Regions:
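Active-site-proximal cap/lid insertion segments
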Residues: 23, 30-46, 92-94, 141, ...
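Structural recognition of the beta-strand scaffold that forms the well-ordered cores
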Residues: 26-29, 60-66, 71-72, 77-80, ...
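Active-site segment of extracytoplasmic enzymes that catalyze sulfate/phosphate-ester chemistry
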Residues: 35-126, 146, 150, 156, ...
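Sec-dependent signal peptide recognition
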Residues: 2-7
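Polar, surface-exposed loop/tail segments
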Residues: 49, 78, 133, 288-291, ...
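Low-complexity, glycine/alanine/valine/leucine- and proline-rich hydrophobic stretches
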Residues: 410-425
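Short Gly/Pro-enriched turn/cap motifs at secondary-structure boundaries
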Residues: 67-68, 110, 323-328, 400-404, ...
């Protein structure tokens, strides 16, 4: 079976005939898109026909996990194939929260010593491009120094000042997103990032390319074209007014339970249109037979906040909590891979993580694996080609920080169907069987103490292995 897969990949990536060029890769990263925020993953409120069609063409991962519940750490794992705790990038860069513990220190940039996935493709003769959100360091650590020959609308900011041109906010370095050449007043950022990406694909149509389109959407501020918002306003009105019953408490925070935010829905629609335009350009250029498209989010949807504002972006039900938390709502996310030659319409249920994309994309492209670099990732190529997945393995999370969502310093491990969450303030922990309790409502610590002890021991062993920084008493 392995030989069959290798032969298929060789046909695609290297070519057994002159007419088979190397595989192009388009990696589309969405910011804060929740697990159930698209039609193919179960939403009935958001409309995502192009994303749904992409999944129908390829593989949909139903148990994909982001490496962190916040953006910068997950993005670091995508670029390196390493766990954020190993890189010591465990918080969103710039994040600071006060609490009972002194939060752990963390790195504020992606080290240049890492061989990024951009460098891996560039060093194999690919044209490389990075468009959109970076959030992995300031000047001196930007993507043009990390393997990407072409970049656009990239800086250290985690969100724009506005999604309508001009995008930057000179009064806040966190939202200082540069404008694009050719912008007109009111240009919508999601559309413009797509325009630039299409130009990159067009320019490099006759050579192998690796493009990362990293949308700022659907991160706050929640803004979208008025006519699209109006349509979803009507759709939300049909659901009836939002009330206290559509929220539940999560410790000191509040979690939204119903998808009904019209502006957020309009932002998702714009992102879906971006995916459709990318796929159509690839088809128009006649390169679809040697171009893979990967669609992924960097963490769960923003459903949980400290303040009860009735303005959370989305709901992740049946998952618990959202962005910032190590419950499923914060770390389970969509992943779709459409690769030429792979079976269409696959639903892959094996637990996987952001760290896996680096070796996966190398193998799909027929490039040499770099196991000393992607230490914490395993290739999913066999699963994508319908030939079995990786062996069962534990997945780990480490978040030694406080977050505006209400989460506190914590760690987690999933091993098989069992998942344990450890709270660093008081040393408490919770155990859930995800096969029977996806919403993490029934804590099994009292019923299965041996399993809890086994998972806790493995989580603590792993933290020692990767040198994870811990919070300290004040």
């Amino acid at each position: 079976m392995k030989k069959t897969l290798l032969f298929a990949l060789a046909l695609i990536a290297v070519g057994c005939a002159e007419s088979t060029p190397p595989l192009n890769v388009v990696l589309i990263v969405i910011d804060d898109l929740g697990w159930i925020d698209t039609g193919v993953y179960g939403s009935s409120f958001y409309e995502t026909p192009h994303i749904d069609q992409l999944a129908a063409r390829g593989a949909r991962f139903s148990q994909f996990y982001t490496a962190s519940a916040v953006c910068s750490p997950t993005r670091a794992s995508l670029m390196t194939g390493k766990h954020p705790a190993r890189l010591d990038i465990t918080n969103w860069i710039g994040g600071e929260q006060n609490g009972l513990l002194q939060q752990a220190t963390y790195e504020r940039q992606l080290p240049l010593e890492e061989t990024t996935i951009g460098e891996a493709f560039r060093d194999n003769g690919y044209a490389t491009g990075y468009v959109g959100k970076w959030h992995l360091g300031r000047e001196g650590f930007m993507p043009e120094l990390q393997g990407f020959d072409f970049t656009a609308t990239v800086n250290h900011a985690g969100q724009p000042g506005s999604y309508f041109s001009p995008y930057g906010n000179e009064n806040s370095p966190r939202t200082a997103v540069p404008d694009l050449e050719g912008d007109s007043a009111g240009s919508y950022l999601t559309d413009r990032l797509t325009d630039v990406s299409l130009d990159f694909i067009e320019r490099n149509r006759d050579q192998p390319f690796f493009l990362t389109l990293s949308h700022y959407s659907v991160h706050t501020p929640l803004q979208a074209p008025e006519e699209t918002v109006a349509r979803y306003d009507r759709k939300a009105a049909a659901l009836g007014p939002e009330t206290e019953e559509h929220y539940e408490s999560e410790r000191d925070a509040s979690t939204k339970l119903r998808q009904d935010h019209a502006t957020y829905a309009a932002m998702i629609e714009s992102t879906d249109e971006s995916v459709g335009r990318i796929v159509e350009k690839i088809r128009e250029l006649g390169i679809e037979e040697h171009t893979a498209v990967v669609f992924v989010s960097d963490n769960g949807g923003l459903s949980t906040l400290m303040r009860r504002s009735f303005n959370q972006a989305t709901a992740n039900m049946p998952l618990r909590a959202g962005k910032g938390w190590l419950y499923e709502g914060g770390i389970r996310a969509p992943l779709i891979v459409a690769a030429p030659g792979a079976p269409a319409g696959l639903d892959i249920a094996q637990p996987t993580t952001s760290n896996d994309l680096y070796p996966t994309l190398l193998e799909l492209a027929g490039l040499t694996q770099m196991p000393e670099q992607h230490l914490d990732g395993e290739s999913l190529a066999s699963a994508i080609f319908g030939q079995g997945g990786t062996a069962e393995r534990p997945l780990y999370w480490h978040f030694p920080h406080y977050h505006g969502s209400g989460n506190r310093p914590s760690g987690a491990i999933r091993w098989g169907d069992l998942k344990l969450i450890e709270w660093f303030e008081d040393g408490g922990f919770e155990l859930y069987d995800l096969s029977a309790d996806l919403g993490e409502r029934r804590d099994l610590v009292g019923e299965r103490p041996e399993d809890a002890a086994r998972l806790l021991s493995e989580l603590q062993r792993w933290r020692g292995e990767v040198g994870a920084n811990m919070p300290t008493p004040r």
